[in-house]
Amino acid sequence: MARLFVISGPSGAGKGTLIRGVLEQRPDIAQVATSATTRPMRPGEEEGREYFFLSTDAFLAKVDEDDFVEWVEFAGNHYGTLKSEVDRLLGQGANVILELEVDGSLVIKEARPDACLIFIDTDLAELRRRLISRQTEGLDEIDRRLQIAEEQSKDKLRFDHVVHNDRVERAVAELLSTLERELDR
């Protein structure tokens, strides 16, 4: 039976990097469901790969039509997981990975108790360094995201697993091992 995995953690914790690392080693283990967002596209991103980029009006219309499994407003933008995307992948028999913010992850757990939630954790100094090196936000926004991250880390005990991302290679191995153990259950 196909499984739903939710990978979450603060902005800059390395969720996407770790997911890519796992899929490079085991491309057969799962497929990533593409989320929708109203945030601007970053350099190197493509429509339908990292996100479905929607206008605020289009996003809110989908909210009104109950098209999302979950959606949240975070840092002034909307993020959501389309039901159609998750159902399409699960219907194909694929294990599905969702990369979500913490609040969205907890909504998924309520709606789908069989989902496996994995929190990607890192210390705040490392998080600050990563956010600065990403060069996509100003210092005020980075400070705001760090405050949010501190709050979000309080919820990590509500997750099924916590992976500490101190070194990417080690954290990729831990995340892959966690997914494999869950699939063997």
Predicted features, each with a name:
Residues 19-20:
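The feature captures the helix immediately C-terminal to the Walker
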Residues 57-67, 81-136, 179:
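ATP-dependent NMP and nucleoside kinases share a basic, alpha-helical "lid"
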Residues 44-56, 61:
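Conserved P-loop
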Residues 13:
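ATP-binding Walker
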Residues 16:
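Walker A/P-loop
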Residues 28-41:
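Short beta-strand-centered segment that lines the nucleotide-binding/catalytic pocket of NTP-utilizing
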Residues 5, 114, 129, 133-137, ...:
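NTP-dependent small-molecule kinase module
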Residues 8-10:
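P-loop (Walker A) phosphate-binding loop of NTP-binding proteins
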